Structure formats: structure tokens, C-alpha cells
Amino acid sequence: MHKNSHTRPSFLFIFLIIIMALSNPVHAAGLSIKDVLPGKGFAENWVIEEKVQLYDKDTLFDHIDGEAELYFPYGFDAMATASYVNKQNPDLSIVADVYRMASVLDAFGIYSNYRKTNNLWVAIGAEGFVSSSQLMFYQDRYFVRLQVAGATSLEKDIFLACARTISGNLPAGSGQPKELEILKIPALVPKSERYLAQSLLGYVFFRKGIIADAAAQDEKMQIFVIHEDTQAAARKTFDQYHSYLKAEGQGIQMTGNPARMQVIAVDPLYGGVLVEQSGRYVIGAVRVKNTSVAKQLIDELHGRISADAGQ
């Protein structure tokens, strides 16, 4: 009897947890992207016009013909879209698009292609911004884009009501991608980070990476980080860039050791550059005018890599 009195509450607690998880689409396995969009409406007088439409890699061009190619390198998987009309003004509507990408980093990557450092930020998802005509945010591996139709502007509160409803139907996620942490040095210009899923700086040997604006001691430049799987892969990437600079660049200086190689040069496209291979990473600064300031920023990036690796 004593044993059963303890066992039953435990089983009851576990059963209730399972029921709660399955009843919430956010936590249920196999969340359908179709269920992310409100099925009827999101606020008073705002109702869905037609059923939710779904698109995949083969049909995305039908919805965003001029932009579809931008999404594919970020692991685009599926997209759901719906229009919500105002019952008092049927010509006014919001088009809501939800894109499912490969990862939170990829969702950030798409989002970062649209944001600007002077946007009006809103507390939606991991990060979001709103203007008079649109609202965008990303959350977990989803990118959400809301746009007004039938008018040139819409009240911010209407955008926010729609965005919050969609956000509540998405997995909560863990905030911003951890890959951004390395760039968080004092010189970083806030909200300037961009993740490029292919050909960072336009160079095929820089397969993918994160780039951002930096400002220190009255100097402006761009800093970047490329995360390779191994130190050998990072060295190969570094060597490919070094070979390119030897063929096309000027004023090349090479220093360091096998674990931390550094090159200073003039890139034909980006002017002064300082690039370093640091373990599994390639880090660098471009558009450099003051090499000593660039070295300081690279040292700070290297310090964050070392701290992250527990070295």
C-alpha cells in the first residue's frame, strides 16, 4: 500500500505532462508549418481570406519569383502563406509568410538580409523589426514576413497582433544563434551582423560565414568569422585566400605559427585586409586603413574563440 501511494501520483504527473505536450502544437512532434498561421483570424475584424497555401523548393518561385534563389542556400524546406483581410475594409489585407529553414542560424541568415541597423526593433521571437508597411522576425528555425496589401502603410499594433499570434504557434527556440557570440566585441556595430550561407565576400573558398560592421578609434571596417569543422579545413581555407592574394593582391606579409597564421595585404576588392587562421576558425577584417586597430580587433576575436573553446 505504501508503495502504490507514491507510484500513482508519479504516473499521474507524467500522464498530465504528456497530454499537455501533445495538446500544444508547439511542443508536439512533427509541427506542421500550416498550423503556424492563424486558421480564422488574429484580431477583431481581421479574418483569413482563403485557406493557408503551402510551397516547397519546387514551387516557391510561384510565390516569390524574384527572391526564391536567395532562400535555397539557407536550407529552405517549406513555406506557408495566408492573407488576412479587414472586414470593415476588404481592400486592406496583411500577407503573412512563414518560411522553415534548416536551422536557427539559417533563419537568422535570411532575416539578416533584410534588416538594417536603423530599423525600429520589436520584441518578437529572437529578434524582429517593423516599419509602416511590413514586419519581420525570426524564431527557432522559422523566418516570418508580414506585409500590408491594398495600402502603403498599416498601424504598428496590427502588425504586432498578427506577429504575436504566429510567434505563439512556433517553437520557442533558444534565442539568437550561438555562432554570433564570437563577433560580440566592443567595436561591433549592433545589429549589423549578417550570415552568408555561401561565398562570403564573394569568394568561393570562403564557403560561408558571418560578417559585421565594426568601429573603433575613429576607424571603420568589417570583421568576419568563418567556422570550419576542423583546424585542417580552416588552414586550407586560409591557404586558398593567401594564394589568391599572392596572385592578385599587394603588400603581403605573413606571420604566425601552424595553429595561428596571419596575413596582412591589400585585397583588390576590399582594400586593406588582415586575416587569421585561429584553430578551426578563419577570422579577419577588411576595408582596413589602420592595421594596428585591425590587429586589436582580431586579437579580441581570437580571445573570444579561445574562451569559447575553453583554452
Task: Please tell me what each predicted stretch does.
Residues 23-311:
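Soluble, non-membrane globular domain cores that form compact, hydrophobic packing
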Residues 9-13, 127:
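Short non-domain terminal segments
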Residues 12-23:
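Bacterial N-terminal signal peptides
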Residues 1-8:
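N-terminal secretory signal peptides that target proteins for export/translocation
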